[in-house]
Amino acid sequence: MRPLVATVDLSAIRHNYALAKRCAPQRQAFAVVKANAYGHGAREVVTALHDDADGFAVACLEEAAEVRALHASARILLLEGCFEASEYALAGQLRLDLVIQGAEQGEAFLAAGLDIPLNVWLKLDSGMHRLGFDPAALRAWHARLRSHPGVRELNLISHFACADERNHPLTEQQLESFLGLLDLDFDQRSLANSAAVLTIPAAHMDWLRPGIMLYGSTPLADLSAAELGLKPAMSLGAQLISLREVAVGESVGYGATWIAERPARIGTVSCGYADGYPRTAPAGTPVLVGGRRAILAGRVSMDMLAVDLSDLPEARVGDPVELWGAGLSVDEVARACGTLGYELLSKVTARVPRRYSH
C-alpha cells in the first residue's frame, strides 16, 4: 500500500467545538461540515459530534441529505439555499433550516407551497457583496414572510468578509448593518464565523457558525491555532521512499528549477499534487522528516515531492514524513504556499486514505 494517510483526530474536533461554545455561553452553534467537513470526512465528523452539536451547516442539498441520514433530529442549515425550484420539496422532507439569499429564492420558496413549515434564514448582504439582500429589500421580505404559513421561524443571517483581520473597518460596518435590522421581529440571529466566535463577542447573537476552527486551523491572520487553544485535527503523513546524492550544479525535479548550491542529499516523499498537496508549494516549504525539519526542493510532482536532507544525515528510506499535523501546523505550510489552511485541508483528495482516532 502506498505510504500516505490522513489521520483525523476526532477528539480534537470535539475539543474545538467545545471551545467555540465556551467563547459564547448560552449560545448555540452550527458545526460547519460543508465540503466533506473541510476534507476530514463528513460522516465521521457528524458522528463524532452527534451528541454535542446543536446543529450542522452545509452548502448543498446533497450534503444536507448525508447529514440527515446520520442525525434524525439535528438542525441542518443550508447555507446557500436551494439552487433550483425542484429542490424545495426535498428541503422540506429533510426539515432543513433554509437560507433565502435573494428574491429569486424567495419567490421559489413561496411558490413551492411546502406542507411542513421550515425555519427560514433571510440573508443580509452586510458588506461582503456575495450573497444576500440589501437592508431595504430584506425589510420587504421580512414583511412578506413574517406570518407566512410555510415559515416556522423567521431568522436573520449574514457573513463577515474580513473578520480574520482584527479591527478591520469593514467588520464594524457589517456589524452595524446587521444590528440596524434588529428592530424587526426575528426569532434567531446568526453572524459569527470562526474568527468572530473567537474575537468579536458583539457578533455572537443566537447561533454561532464555527467552521475552520473545528479542524484546528486558525481563522486569524495574527494568532496561531495553538495560541487560540485549538487542536489540529488532521495529520497528513507520508514516507521517504528514495534517497540520493546530488552534486553542486545538478537540478532536482520538473523544470530543473532547483539547483544544488552545495553537495546535497535529496529525499523523495510519497505525496504529490494528485493527493492535494499544492503544486505551487515553493522550494523551502517546511516538512518534518523523522520529526525534524526539512524543506522542499524543486517542484511538486503528481505523486511525489522532493526534500533537501543535506542537514539530516541520519534520514533513511522508510522514515515518516509529516506534511502537516501536530508537529507542523497546516497554517505554516499554507503561508509558505501563499494560501490558507482551509484550502490545504479541503483539497486532500479521495485517494488519500483517512484513518480516525477517537
From Swiss-Prot:
Catalytic activity field: L-alanine = D-alanine
One of the record's GO cellular component terms: cytosol
Binding site for substrate: 130, 302
GO MF, one annotated term: pyridoxal phosphate binding
Gene Ontology BP, a term: D-alanine biosynthetic process
Residues with N6-(pyridoxal phosphate)lysine modification: 34
Active site: 34, 254
Top-rank lineage group of the source organism: Bacteria
TM region positions: none
EC number of this enzyme: 5.1.1.1
Function: Catalyzes the interconversion of L-alanine and D-alanine. Provides the D-alanine required for cell wall biosynthesis.
HAMAP family: Ala_racemase (MF_01201)
PANTHER family (alphabetical): ALANINE RACEMASE, ALANINE RACEMASE, CATABOLIC-RELATED
Protein name: Alanine racemase, biosynthetic
